Amino acid sequence: MFPMVTGFMNYGQQAVRAARYIGQSFMITLSHANRLPVTIQYPYEKSITSERFRGRIHFEFDKCIACEVCVRVCPIDLPVVDWRFETDIRKKRLLNYSIDFGICIFCGNCVEYCPTNCLSMTEEYELSTYDRHELNYNQIALGRLPIPVVGDYTIQTIMNSNQTKIAMNKPLDSRTITNY
């Protein structure tokens, strides 16, 4: 008879523990119920990206010395650098530079290790196309700067909740929103 009593006690303890776990999970669910929704109406509302966001790469053709450091540090050997050695000035001359963003993992190693800072990350993340071959950007397409989201009057920008409060008397421009 003694084992039967301990079995009922274990069953009772397990039932109380299960009820406590169910109650805790229900309280977590209720605490999330009164929060504002995170979703936004994307084409018309865009959230402002953080300062260290890794978007499309911007390339400045005039600064590049064709050293190919970006190719060596890239984990997938992605940037294609075509150059020719000019014997009269004894320097490399850059002919073509391209990056395929369909393959790029946006790690930022090329930007970090570039000795002349000719590569930089932009805040552009809208790279979707119907043809994957359109994601292969040459030096001309990489040299174009994206339109900033903050300055666009047709799009309502949604600020993240963890951003600092911006003074109401300051106009919204790209210099105002820097601390994320």
Curated annotation (Swiss-Prot):
Q: How does it assemble?
A: NDH is composed of at least 16 different subunits, 5 of which are encoded in the nucleus.
The enzyme's E.C. designation: 7.1.1.-
Q: What does this protein do?
A: NDH shuttles electrons from NAD(P)H:plastoquinone, via FMN and iron-sulfur (Fe-S) centers, to quinones in the photosynthetic chain and possibly in a chloroplast respiratory chain. The immediate electron acceptor for the enzyme in this species is believed to be plastoquinone. Couples the redox reaction to proton translocation, and thus conserves the redox energy in a proton gradient.
Which residue pairs form cystines in this protein? none
UniProt: [4Fe-4S] cluster 1 binding residues: 64, 67, 70, 114
Alphabetical list of HAMAP family matching this protein? NDH1_NuoI
Membrane topology (UniProt): Peripheral membrane protein
Q: Which cofactor does it need?
A: [4Fe-4S] cluster
Keywords annotated in UniProt: 4Fe-4S, Chloroplast, Iron, Iron-sulfur, Membrane, Metal-binding, NAD, NADP, Plastid, Plastoquinone, Quinone, Repeat, Thylakoid, Translocase
Q: Reply yes or no: does the keyword Coiled coil apply.
A: no
* Originating organism: Amborella trichopoda
Give the record's GO biological process terms. photosynthesis, light reaction
Family of this protein: Belongs to the complex I 23 kDa subunit family.
Lineage of the source organism?
Answer: Eukaryota, Viridiplantae, Streptophyta, Embryophyta, Tracheophyta
Protein's recorded name: NAD(P)H-quinone oxidoreductase subunit I, chloroplastic
Q: Which residues form the 4Fe-4S ferredoxin-type domain?
A: 55-84, 95-124
Any one GO CC term of this protein is:
chloroplast thylakoid membrane
The gene designation is ndhI
Q: Where is the signal peptide?
A: none
